[in-house]
Amino acid sequence: MKKILFRLFLSVFLVAAANAAAKTKVDIRPDGLYLTDVTVAQLEKQYELYGYKDYIYMPDWVYPPIFLTNLPTDFDRISDANRRNKLFLQIIGPLALKLRDELREERLAVRELRAAFLEGADLTPEQERFVEEKAVKYDIFTRMKGRRRYDILLKRLELKVDIVPPSLLMAAAAIESDWGTNRIVREGNSLYKELAWYTDKGLKPQDDRQDQSYRYKTFPSLYDSMKSYALRLNSSVNYEQMRLYRAEIEYREKPVFGRSLAHTMLFDSNLKNFAGLLDYTITFYELTNFDEAELGFVRLPNLEDKK
């Protein structure tokens, strides 16, 4: 799929808000435009400049790299549920594509290293550190030593370090966050109601009758929440069936779609029939389109001016 260049536009409305020392923060980076504490009106104006008027039907399925740190400050005041849901998907769609690309690069590094290892190459000390760090990250353990150790670690890493379809990430976020309206995502940027046990860090359950031994995890950004959730899917024993089924699809050289994995998500939520809810949400909102979509890239103004 071809990449599309998005010239970097900033709406006058958005720049004015930032320059007026408002809470709104605009961060221009080589990979995209990062926005913090924007209002719905500011965000929709910015989307309009990029032709991003709906979460689907973008030309060539290429999406502008506009990444929100948090949901708009007045997001929960949108009274029209249909409009609110569509804007929610517009917001998290680029984040899911960004994470998919990041996981794809991480997987490529693991696969290339394992391929060289299987051909007889010895790992350098730097490569050994890389493997050990990934093993800790993805909760992989073995008591074996030497070359046998890295054979086991790399094999297990190749199963775990893999993409999570954007449609699956988006549907799960919509369901768990009540389409971006619940307290957990508004106060803690937590899209998936992830829990932390026996700690004072995080958001307390509001109902005093609930178990007080846990907290809802909080995150610096929506993207950090999505990364944490994807890591859970790729590392926890509860999702081994999902990972094995994903590997089987890839072995047959087929694309991995969110709907293909939805039925394996039986232990992902306290909600009844969560797997069915995932399948329905992906289907009804046509989120499978995101599984084959790509992010465009921006050209910064100073680079454009030099040409």
Predicted segments, located by residue:
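Bacterial N-terminal signal peptides
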Residues: 8-16
